[in-house]
């Protein structure tokens, strides 16, 4: 029996469709940071039809955290605008399933859970702008260490929509001062994948008390000559929806994105 592959860009296909096939076959279950470089990655939220409008409105009001790039018709598991044969039931390395907002369980496929009233949302991910940062020689420590990006809940309020409200989640990348300035200039060009940072510097100012203990992802060390740079994160919907307690909600596991065929340069 084939064993799942470990995260290593050199061992995994660069073609996003080939990578999705590997994921669909259960051969890769890890995070997707640094994989299929140059292609858009997406956070995933799946809700029942009766919650879909509230979430659509939430995305419109909180575009920094939830830049919507595609949505499916009710009951249709295929994203028609993200590439060829993109099946949301099988093409994410790891899913989280929440019921009534309670503790999640993780699974590598949701075909057996799929319902005719499910609507799937694809939300832009900061992994997509990492290629532009690397091309500009901005070092990304989490990729160099083979880790998931660090993500934190903050004290920053999102704008409420219907039954949905809550705090912003951010991703953090340690950068030297000059690189932080360059990264801000570069990521501002990518509003469909979170755009420019929401905060630079002291994490306590946005409600993060212990930067060494992320709420999601992996801890990434901060050297003395580095400052933390924070971007709005597509894990925000998971925190918000969990508080709203819908009957069922399915998301990607943090860091385990849907890799699309879309070119980052078209964003």
Swiss-Prot record:
<dbReference type="InterPro" id="IPR016938">
    <property type="entry name" value="UPF0317"/>
</dbReference>
<comment type="similarity">
    <text>Belongs to the D-glutamate cyclase family.</text>
</comment>
<keyword id="KW-0456">Lyase</keyword>
<protein>
    <recommendedName>
        <fullName>Putative hydro-lyase RALTA_B1245</fullName>
        <ecNumber>4.2.1.-</ecNumber>
    </recommendedName>
</protein>
<dbReference type="InterPro" id="IPR038021">
    <property type="entry name" value="Putative_hydro-lyase"/>
</dbReference>
<dbReference type="Pfam" id="PF07286">
    <property type="entry name" value="D-Glu_cyclase"/>
</dbReference>
<dbReference type="GO" id="GO:0016829">
    <property type="term" value="F:lyase activity"/>
</dbReference>
<dbReference type="InterPro" id="IPR009906">
    <property type="entry name" value="D-Glu_cyclase"/>
</dbReference>
């Amino acid at each position: 029996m084939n064993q799942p592959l470990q995260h290593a860009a050199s061992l995994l296909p660069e073609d996003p469709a080939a990578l999705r096939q590997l994921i669909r076959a259960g051969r890769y279950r890890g995070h997707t940071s640094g994989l299929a470089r140059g292609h858009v990655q997406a956070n995933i939220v799946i809700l029942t039809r009766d919650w879909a409008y509230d979430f659509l409105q939430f995305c419109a009001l909180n575009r920094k955290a939830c830049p919507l790039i595609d949505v499916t018709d009710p009951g249709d598991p295929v994203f028609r605008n993200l590439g060829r044969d993109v099946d949301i039931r099988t093409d994410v390395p790891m899913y989280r399933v929440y019921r009534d907002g309670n503790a999640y369980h993780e699974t590598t496929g949701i075909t057996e859970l799929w319902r005719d009233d499910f609507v799937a949302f694809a939300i832009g991910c900061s992994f997509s702008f990492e290629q532009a940062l690397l091309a500009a020689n901005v070092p990304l420590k989490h990729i160099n260490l083979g880790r998931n990006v660090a993500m934190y809940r903050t004290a920053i309020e999102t704008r409420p929509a219907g039954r949905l409200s809550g705090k912003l989640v951010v991703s953090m990348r340690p950068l030297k001062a000059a690189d932080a300035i360059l990264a801000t200039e570069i990521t501002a060009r990518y509003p469909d994948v979170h755009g420019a940072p929401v905060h630079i510097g002291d994490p306590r100012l946005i409600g993060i008390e212990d930067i060494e203990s992320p709420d999601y992802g992996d801890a990434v060390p901060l050297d003395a000559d580095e400052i933390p740079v924070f971007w709005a994160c597509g894990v925000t919907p998971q925190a918000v929806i969990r508080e709203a307690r819908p009957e069922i909600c399915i998301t990607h596991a943090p860091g385990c994105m849907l890799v699309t065929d879309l070119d980052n340069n078209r964003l």
